[in-house]
């Protein structure tokens, strides 16, 4: 288990990837404490002076002009958490909630939120104790922030709701006992600061980003395997072609294929003088398609890395002047659009992979046995595996419809344009599973095709990837229960082992 000393606003994507996939212990860097204390002191000064400021001693949304008396300020903060915890659906995975909590801690600790150190330390202790609030997946429109999910997270501080501890669901009070904590009373602005922000949608989108990066790496390796299995040409990866166009993602993708395929192999040398003039697009245009996907993944990484370190609650406290200013950083449009772009990339990675599977099983295109099996007719081979891949790729095309173009007014039209970022990000998990399934089938098909090319050998990287698969799935010599093969291939992809095949600097988080 790793230990992170959090310097607010400085999380790297590599660190965030680790937080999203592994448990950790957390502590605040000493230099953050002064900013937190100054910020919360400004809020207390406003109350002491009897000034009226939105978010501190007013109502919310359409009720923003309603002044709240000092005696009701703690009740106001408790009430907003309870009333806004209106999510529905299955609970988020513990890993998602852990990342959401760390992102919220990171944001609150920047010193713009007017929240006490005691509250931030409470969240840190929950993370360290592995006590994660139970947060329903559905119920946020991504403005004003992820209100429902973050309210469910905040319930735990009040001793309300449920938590998850080592896979067991229990009451928040039981979870607090395990963490050695007592419920706390929230002071002015603290409830609003906790539940206002984009941390739920950002956590989900970051998980989608890391999956997309893994699947891009896998798609590159498996795509190179298919080039060798189908006896494809290396000339489409010539750097001069891609330099002439000038698209960086495409140039980098082409370079990656040159890295994986090398200058030549026994297989490539065997068909130098073949009669085939050009390969189908699913082989030949991989740099163009994967390069475009790479560009979208990189842009999403930049946006989400910034958002993970940003302050997205409202209003914000500015220490240099003592001003408290209302704005709209809670609007998650950047997250929604980044997630939409990731969705398009995930759909395309799966779509072109499915076409390569179709190519490999078609003897007219691949010059391999029909459906990649001996004694065809008696054996059906990869016939229905390709149908499964087609079903998964097709499902992703529907998922890829942009969520950010939708909006429904809420809060009596005060919040009249919203981002739908949480759904935009949440569907990335299903899309990643689908694309992973398509690539798992292509990995099986490409390895099978390479076995038919024996004794000719592919490039070293392709041979290594095939050997990894053959450790868990044997050659398909005759029909057998196909499901376990797909499952084993999928499990191999889940290890992210193909990430190590990529040169440094291709992707942002590793």
Curated annotation (Swiss-Prot):
Keywords: Cytoplasm, Histidine metabolism, Lyase. It comes from Shewanella woodyi (strain ATCC 51908 / MS32). One of its GO terms (molecular function) is histidine ammonia-lyase activity. Belongs to the PAL/histidase family. Contains an active site 4-methylidene-imidazol-5-one (MIO), which is formed autocatalytically by cyclization and dehydration of residues Ala-Ser-Gly. SUPFAM superfamilies: L-aspartase-like. This is Histidine ammonia-lyase. It catalyses: L-histidine = trans-urocanate + NH4(+).
